[in-house]
Amino acid sequence: PQGESIAAVPAGVTAYRKGLFKLTPYDQQSAAETLDIMEEYCARCRKQYGRSVVYPSDEWYLLAGREVPPAEFYDNYDQLEDGVGMWRMYHDSFWDELQFPRSNVEPRSIDVVTGTLAAPLIREMAEATHAKYPQISVTVHAIQNDYFGGTVSVAGLVTGTDIIKQCKGNLSSNILCVPEVMLRDEKDRFLDDLTAKQLGEALGCEIEVIPTDGAGGCKAYLGELKPKPKRKKLHFSFGGR
């Protein structure tokens, strides 16, 4: 093939499309039909080239209600940044970490926010954690994306405004875990410019930013992550005193 790999991702349709070309969002049936076509091409490429070449993103499987493929399907996870194989990697990493033997796990109750698309899978991980360690309670909140509207359902586009609106008065603990994928590169602001500190103040709780990898997520649930030290601001003066 002329390219190393191709990621197939469903278009995200927001509520702000007035005057733009009409796009029809995928539903469970159309996502399943599209997956069937892509998986046929994947099988052909794997037979001819020894790898899939075409990689459907995780959204297709979640929309279609299908289990994501095993790790072998994703080869080297070349399209991870486009959301291809992210859930499989998260799931396997989380499960491996959860199986690691532990003793004296302290009781802990937390709330976790995520997008509506991944919520069933995150709940699965939360329930698995509670089953192994009954003293750990994890309440998962699926945040409906009112800020962007439309069919936007991924965790990475959830805003602080929507979290406040949907979680205020509904938390089961004083700790809210926010996946770092919801924050900008600086890891301190949501897409609506609300800071993690402002979120905590609005909800009256502590905010814990948790890693997007499965092992880190598992450790966060168990209270094993140490807070990262804050970077010191450097002050420079040029000329004069």
Regions found by a protein language model. Give the residues of each.
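Auxiliary Fe-S-binding modules of radical SAM enzymes
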Residues: 5-7, 12-241
